[in-house]
Each structure stands twice: as C-alpha cells, then as structure tokens.
C-alpha cells in the first residue's frame, strides 16, 4: 500500500493536466492541430496539401477524407523503407489491423512519436486516472498481466516489425516496466494463441497479480485455463490482490457477468480504455460512469461525421466544438503516426461536453439497417443485457444479420448466440430481447409495428466454441481480432451457420 501511495504522487501533476480538459478543450485541440501540421509540412503528404500554408481549420478542410484504401499506396512505400512520406523520418512499426470485417489486412503506421505521445501516454494515463478513482489501491504491490498478440518481420527490413499493436507495445516497452509485468516477453509475443494461453497459465499462477490488461474475450480464455489448472473456482483465490482489469477492443457488456462470477472479490474494478491500432482515444475517468473521457492532448486531432452522412461522397465534417450530445458520429482522426483526416470506422456518442465524454456506439460497418431500423451495437448490447437479466442467461459471443425474405416472404433479424449459461426459457429470452430493442430504438420499434416490415427476431443457439472455431479458421485467434456483432449482409453469419453442426 505504501509503495502505491508513494508512486501515486508521481501521477498528480498529470491528473491536474487532464483536469484542464473541462475548460480548455478547444485550445488544447488547437495546439495539437498546429503541432501536427507544422511537424508534417516537409513530408510528401504535407507538400501535396501545402501544409506550410495551412493557418486555420478551414484551410485544413482542403485535405480529403481518407480511408485505408486511399493511403494504402503510401503505406506500402513506407513499409519498403521510404522516408518522409506521411510523417517525418522512417516508420518501422506497423500495426496489422483487420478485425474480421475485411479479409485484406490493414497495416497502420506506428511512428516513434505516435508510440510515445499517443499509445504509451494512454497506458500511463489509465493508471493515473485509476489511482485517482481508487485511492485505496494496492496497484503497485504486485504485477500486471498484459495480454498481447504477436509480430513478425516487415519485408525483412532491419528492426522493422508488423503485427498486433499490443505486440508492438510490448516489444518497445520501457525496460523498467518489465519488472512489474507478466508474462515474459518471450511468452507474451508467441504467435500461437493456444500455446500462449497454456504458457501464461503455467507461469503466472504463483505471481502476485494486481491488474489485468487486454481484450475481454481473450483474457477470459486465459482466466478459464488458469482455473482449470489450479482447480480453483474463482480467480481471486489465486490472485487475492487482483483489483482492476483495463479492458478494450470489444464491448464489455456481454462479458461483465462472467467476470463477476469468476472474480468474486468486492474490491475488483473494471476500467474501459479506447485503444486501437490507429491510436489511443479515450479512458474511463470515473469507475461509476461508463462514458469515457476523450483524451485531448495526445498527438490526435479529432473531427466527426454525423452517421447519417457517412455514405455521402462529400459528407459534412465537424470539429469537436460542434458535436451534439446523444448523436452518433463516425470519428475522424489526424495523428503523429501519419494518418490524416482518417475514418477509423468506429462510431461514438457524446454524453457530455465539459469535459467531453462519450461511449462507443458501434462501427460504421457494424449495424443493421436493411429495413431502415438503424440497429447499432450499443442497442444490441443493452438489449442482450436486459434479456440475460430476465432469464438468468449469460451470453459468451453473438452475431446478428438480417433475413431479407424467406419462403414465407417474412423479413427479420437473425441472431446467432453462444451462451455460457442458457436462459431458463429461450422463448422468453427472444421476446425480451425483441421488446428491449423496440424500447431502446424507435426506428426498430416502427419497423416492428404489427409485424408489417419486420417479424419478431429469430435466435439460433450456437454450439460451444463456434465463434472460436470461426476465428481460428480465418487465422484470427487472439490479439485484437473480434467477432463482427452486427452485419448488414449475411456473409459472415452464413459462414458461421455452416460451422454450427
């Protein structure tokens, strides 16, 4: 306890800097904007868009909005060793990002500046904000289990790597952090996920672990293997000082009850982080508020596209100051990793503006709008939570898609759900979920009216490990890979249904 209180004092000045967000948000973002533009002015990209003469945000709007395919050619040249393309100098690290939404991998540049002023800054701030929220913390009395992916050489260029962002972070981590981190770097960077889980379980059982960091679905696999090996019922029997899980990558709602059952300690906390291959953007600053604080003084300049504009060839794009509370936006970023006005694919919804706090509401491509219902991932998560509460169920994984018209000319949503605990009544679960979605989403309610457009949703129970096997078939176990929750077409769900035998 003493060590945590002493070390915690080192975070006080940073906590005060973060407090400035509430009153100085626009000024902070203006400073970031100018820094990024000035630093990149002499790059090939900066010359193309005449960054040297950009003075205002209005000037900056001449830079076109980018998606990955728009910058892929530049990134490919950078991966072959070319310098001063999107960011000064040579970028040698590339975060491989695909999720499961696209078979083509994306290789996101991760510059030294980006590592320092975005990714590692986010990790440090997570601890700073956690210690403020939990002054009784014993965080530094033990070690942190950080679950990451793997990396491999990039075109055999010296010291150049491509892989999961988490692996790049572990590879380049401050050596001092290795004294308070498990597992070893060798184990953490293993490419075979199932072997990694086994080795982590073997080597961490006798450690004093106080904190966990990783993607909830993959961390769950580690926890379950540790419990299997030890015969323990609860993780706090093995790690009695465990107190916080820093989680990100997927929504935690479907996993919360499982974690509560596996970690029964009343001192256990869960803190959401918004870290992606493209950057680190948000942190839960209050453990009692699910919304995250938008991190304003990293090397990230934010813009937003109203979701209804996302398919417009020339969408309306607004700065942070113009966002409205409760509205869905696609996030657009410019960063010191060389991403410029880049659409990252996530949608966010602000809950307040002083300071700016938000929730991740879904993905620009992960929603169902086949019939005008605009069902977002956050709608789905809330609906499932209600259905689980009403029927005693626990959902492990799920994916949903529209049925456009079956033999009886009926349209509906089809949900493929893997339960860790079955509902006491599947029919009641189905009714409750459908009713909850109508309560949450007025567009879905309108389309469900008298079953005219949409019939009541359908649930198919997935066999155990279906989603694990689907990801494995695609070579996407571990790291930051995830199951697509909602899709506007049937491509993914048809693949999954073929495996559901």
Predicted region positions:
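Non-catalytic, beta-rich accessory domains that mediate macromolecular interactions or localization
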Residues: 83-84, 103-114, 237, 244, ...
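Conserved AMP-binding loop of ANL adenylate-forming enzymes
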Residues: 129-175
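Active-site diphosphate/adenylate-binding microenvironment
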Residues: 27, 31-35, 39-94, 105-110, ...
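Short, charged helix-to-loop "capping" segments that act as catalytic/coupling loops
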Residues: 104, 114-118, 262-269
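Conserved helicase ATPase motor motifs in RecA-like P-loop NTPase domains
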Residues: 95-101
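Short, basic alpha-helical nucleic acid-contact segments in DNA-binding proteins
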Residues: 122-127, 288
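Active-site glycine/GP-rich loop and adjacent strand/helix microenvironment
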Residues: 1-52, 59-66, 74-81, 166-501
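Short coil/turn connectors at secondary-structure junctions
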Residues: 104, 140-142, 241-242, 268
